[in-house]
C-alpha cells in the first residue's frame, strides 16, 4: 500500500522578476510590479508531500524526521529572510527567475536530494500570499 505525507513550513524572502537582457520598460511590461528594482517580499507557505510504500513494521510511508530535517536544512535555512536573487545561486540574475513555479521546483529538487530514493517528493505547493499558490508535481 502506498501513502503520502505532507508537511508545511513558512519562510519570508524577497525577490524580483527580471531578465537582464531586457531593459526596465520590457521587464515592467512583462512582469509588472514584480520587476520593481527595489525588490518585494512574501511570507511563503510551502507544503511538501512525499510518498512511499507503507512499512509493515512501522506503519509509516516516510520518515517524518528526515522530511523535517530536509525542510529545515535545505529549504528554510537557505531561503528564510533571504533575497532569493542575491543569496541563492540558482536564482542569481541571469539564472532562474524566482517565480513561484521555479522556487517550488527548486524546493522539490533540494528535498528529494536530502531524502534519497526510498522516499519520493510527490508534490510541492508554494503560496506567496492567501489566494495565490503554485503546485508542481515532479516527474
Regions found by a protein language model. Give the residues of each.
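Charge-rich, low-complexity N-terminal segments
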Residues: 1-139
Amino acid at each position: 500500500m502506498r501513502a503520502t505525507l505532507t508537511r508545511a513550513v513558512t519562510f519570508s524572502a524577497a525577490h524580483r522578476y527580471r531578465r537582464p537582457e531586457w531593459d526596465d520598460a520590457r521587464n515592467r511590461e512583462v512582469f509588472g510590479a514584480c520587476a520593481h528594482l527595489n525588490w518585494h517580499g512574501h511570507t511563503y507557505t510551502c507544503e511538501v508531500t512525499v510518498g512511499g510504500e507503507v512499512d509493515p513494521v512501522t506503519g509509516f510511508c516516510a520518515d517524518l524526521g528526515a522530511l523535517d530535517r530536509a525542510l529545515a536544512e535545505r529549504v528554510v535555512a537557505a531561503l528564510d529572510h533571504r533575497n532569493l536573487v542575491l543569496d541563492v545561486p540558482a536564482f542569481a540574475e541571469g539564472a532562474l527567475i524566482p517565480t513561484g513555479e521555479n522556487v517550488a521546483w527548486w524546493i522539490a529538487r533540494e528535498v528529494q536530494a536530502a531524502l534519497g530514493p526510498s522516499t519520493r517528493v510527490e508534490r510541492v505547493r508554494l503560496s506567496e500570499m492567501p489566494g495565490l499558490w503554485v503546485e508542481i508535481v515532479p516527474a
